[in-house]
């Protein structure tokens, strides 16, 4: 049966006053990139038989709206039915039906199960790179903790939660923390996210770092938690400037030049915090929304797509 046809011209559309439902931010984002590669990536999600489904690209755009406006599935269902600017961004006409929360939830789950969120993220970054928005002057790599969606397990369960075995324990200062850790690679100067990995909170920051080095940047900046001779040697071998802060030890204090380097590197490295702040404050991601690495990892990719689209729209303005 294929998919439903949406966005057809209607009398209701023709009777709308000029400027009705206008949203310049969404209009800029809609015209920012070529959406056809996204449509091709999502094409396998079309049902070959049975009742015609909604176009996967329309559902994907709807999920982006949910990130920007911090909407739950029921809230997104209501907004799509009610807000003209949302309908237009997704491609729905006034006479078209819009997806319910169950459809949206199932679509998001399929994105995660098929690993499509990461492929969509990579396609966006490919296009942003082609437009010259990715500066490649440096990559900022760091990690942040995000609380689990479930309560921490009782002492009787030990260190592994029966409700979410993928979440892990670590310490933040003097306090125990239960949840996940988001590792990001952020482009210096543009603040575009170039790489994102989610792990349990118990995974060390340094373990995900090497996979976040892009290979085409001029320099890499990390805090002292990532300091290792092997990593510095690998960056040198790749011709990448080493911007890792130096870590002192009880038996070996930092030399004066290392302390000076740390002072110089600190304000550069700290710029990665803007991306974390945006995810947590503007996108409400202080706590993950789902259980398990699979769905939460896909959600992180979706959040980064939303973040990059908004950032790119400002950069290209």
Identify the residue ranges that each predicted region occupies.
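Charged, often Cys/His-bearing segments associated with DNA-binding zinc-finger transcription factors
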Residues: 1-35, 39, 312-317
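Basic, short loop/linker segments at the boundary and entry of helix-turn-helix/winged-helix-like folds
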Residues: 19-69
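Secondary-structure capping and boundary motifs in well-ordered enzyme cores
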Residues: 34, 51-57, 96-99, 297-301, ...
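Polybasic low-complexity intrinsically disordered regions
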Residues: 78-81, 90-95, 99-241, 245-247, ...
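Helix-centered, glycine/charged polyanion-binding patches within enzymatic domains
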Residues: 218-219, 224-298
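C-terminal domain-tail junction helix/linker
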Residues: 301-310, 314-317
């Amino acid at each position: 049966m294929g998919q439903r046809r949406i966005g057809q011209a209607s009398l209701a559309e023709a009777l709308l006053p000029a400027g009705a439902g206008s949203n310049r931010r969404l209009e800029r984002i809609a015209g920012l990139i070529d959406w056809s590669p996204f449509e091709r990536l999502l094409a396998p999600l079309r049902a070959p038989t049975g009742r015609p489904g909604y176009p996967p690209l329309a559902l994907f755009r709807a999920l982006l709206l949910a990130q920007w406006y911090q909407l739950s599935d029921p809230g997104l269902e209501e907004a799509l039915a009610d807000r003209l600017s949302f309908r237009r961004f997704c491609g729905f006409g006034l006479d078209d039906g819009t997806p319910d929360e169950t459809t949206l939830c199932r679509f998001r789950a399929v994105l995660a199960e098929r690993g499509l969120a990461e492929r969509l993220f990579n396609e966006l970054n490919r296009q942003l790179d082609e437009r010259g928005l990715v500066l490649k002057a440096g990559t900022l790599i760091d990690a942040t903790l995000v609380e689990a969606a479930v309560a921490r397990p009782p002492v009787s369960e030990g260190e592994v939660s029966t409700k979410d075995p993928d979440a892990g324990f670590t310490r933040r200062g003097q306090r125990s923390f239960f949840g996940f850790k988001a590792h990001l690679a952020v482009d210096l100067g543009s603040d575009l996210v170039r790489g994102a990995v989610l792990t349990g909170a118990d995974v060390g920051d340094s373990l995900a770092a090497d996979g976040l080095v892009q290979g085409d940047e001029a320099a890499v900046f990390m805090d002292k938690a990532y300091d290792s001779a092997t990593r510095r040697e690998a960056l040198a071998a790749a011709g990448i400037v080493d911007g890792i802060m130096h870590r002192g030890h009880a038996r070996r204090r930092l030399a004066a030049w290392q302390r000076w380097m740390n002072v110089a590197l600190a304000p550069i490295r700290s710029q990665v915090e803007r991306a974390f702040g945006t995810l947590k404050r503007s996108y409400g991601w202080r706590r993950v929304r789902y259980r398990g690495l699979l769905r939460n990892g896909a959600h992180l990719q979706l959040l980064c797509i939303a973040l990059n689209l908004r950032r790119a729209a400002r950069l290209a303005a």
